[in-house]
From Swiss-Prot:
Substrate binds at R54, G55, A56, R96, Q205, S256, K257. The active site is at D246 (proton donor). It catalyses: 5-(methylsulfanyl)-alpha-D-ribose 1-phosphate = 5-(methylsulfanyl)-D-ribulose 1-phosphate. Gene3D superfamilies: translation initiation factor eif-2b, domain 1 (1.20.120.420), Translation initiation factor eif-2b, domain 2 (3.40.50.10470). Signal peptide: none annotated. Pfam families: IF-2B. The keyword Isomerase applies. PANTHER family: METHYLTHIORIBOSE-1-PHOSPHATE ISOMERASE. Pathway: Amino-acid biosynthesis; L-methionine biosynthesis via salvage pathway; L-methionine from S-methyl-5-thio-alpha-D-ribose 1-phosphate: step 1/6. This is Methylthioribose-1-phosphate isomerase. Keywords: Amino-acid biosynthesis, Isomerase, Methionine biosynthesis. The keyword Nucleotide-binding does not apply.
Length: 358
């Protein structure tokens, strides 16, 4: 199964080659496939902030490589690189404050610097750590795909119709994807007949990115207006909603793309199972509940500009990027460390316990 999944992988959004970071500019998809070459940390921070790269895991990976570029700059300057590098840690951390993976990756890079041996090549060590973060995320996604498909198999009566929202695919990760990884695996196993994708306003990650990823791999996908998703659940025989996560609190509350919360409410009303697929790096046990997760808001122009024209110029705008889905609306959280059905604080703590062997 794992070999089949790897062979089916066609989309990637992050490349590290000869000391340069290349990011597929997701703002331009699907009309243009343009790669950004990032040569310094300022360019990486801007790419994260401006959503050229997006998705919690992808942001963390890009930030890790950004620190490698930052260190290279600081060493060339010849000053106190350790003190100067703190500015770069801060600029990357502030780029997208909701993504738990971003802070996890930055903390892991900081920890690697603190474990340097006497005489060790600091730049080589940090680059190796960034590459390891990238590769481990892809491996985690492959594991989650297999675990998620076993859940779908357990409840399968016939080929199923799945609904996804936002973009939790290869573009949002180190490869293969989280929610879309499960969907890809289900299609390869003959268990997924059709995927419905919500358009995901206002950035249209569903229509621009998810539909593009699935269509590229020959997976039948139907795009739906966000306002049609409740009707879709009622009329089209949806069996699972499968989404990703940007941050998971200690009690199992999940911050994800704005609109996910109302999707979960509708799923419960219609008896549709709700699955969250995310690496354990998205879990922050320091956040007791979803109320503690910082939720980013973006510029009003994203809602007020249409085809270059300002609409409703006199109104105020509420434009949150994420919302929080309470744990009691979630049937299962799938991570590479294991599967949690009906998540709560005790189950999350057990999953993340350092004494676990797997």
């Amino acid at each position: 199964m794992r070999e089949r999944l790897m062979a089916a992988e066609k989309v990637t959004g992050i490349r590290w080659h000869h000391g340069a970071l290349h990011l597929l500019d997701q703002r331009l998809l699907p009309s243009q496939e343009r790669w950004l070459a990032c040569d310094n940390v300022a360019q990486v921070a801007a790419a994260i902030r401006d959503m050229a790269v997006r998705g919690a895991a992808a942001i963390g990976i890009a930030a890790a490589y950004g620190l490698v570029l930052a260190l290279e700059e600081r060493l060339a300057e010849g000053g106190d690189w350790e003190m100067d590098l703190e500015e770069d840690f801060l600029s990357l951390a502030e780029a997208r404050p909701t993504a738990a993976n971003l802070f996890w990756a930055l903390n892991r890079m900081r920890d690697r610097l603190q474990r340097l041996r006497p005489g060790e090549d600091v730049l080589a060590a940090l680059e190796a750590e960034a590459v390891a973060i990238h590769e481990s995320d892809r491996e985690a996604n492959l594991t989650m795909a297999q675990q998620g498909i076993e859940l779908i198999r357990r409840h399968q009566g016939s080929e199923q119709a799945l609904l996804t929202y936002g973009n939790a695919g290869a573009l949002a990760s180190g490869g293969f994807g989280t929610a879309l990884g499960v969907i890809r695996a289900g299609f390869l196993e003959g268990m997924v007949e059709r995927v419905y994708a919500g358009e995901t306003r206002p950035w249209l990650q569903g229509s621009r990115l998810t539909a593009w990823e699935l269509a590229n791999e020959g997976i039948p996908v139907t795009l739906c207006a966000d306002s049609a998703l409740a009707h879709l659940m009622k009329s089209k025989g949806i069996t699972w909603v499968v989404v990703g996560a940007d941050c998971i609190a200690a009690n199992g509350d999940v911050a994800s793309k704005i609109g996910t919360y109302q999707l979960a409410v509708n799923a419960m009303h219609h008896g549709v199972r709700f699955m969250v697929v995310a690496p354990s790096t998205s879990i922050d046990l320091n956040l007791a509940t979803g109320e503690d997760i910082p939720l980013e808001e973006r510029d009003a122009d994203e809602l007020l500009d249409y085809a270059g024209t300002r609409v409703a110029p006199q109104v105020e705008v509420f434009n949150p990027v994420f919302d929080v889905t309470p744990a009691d609306l979630i049937d299962v959280i799938v991570t590479e460390k294991g599967v949690i059905e009906r998540p709560d604080t005790a189950k999350l703590a057990q999953l993340m316990c350092r004494k676990r062997l797997h």
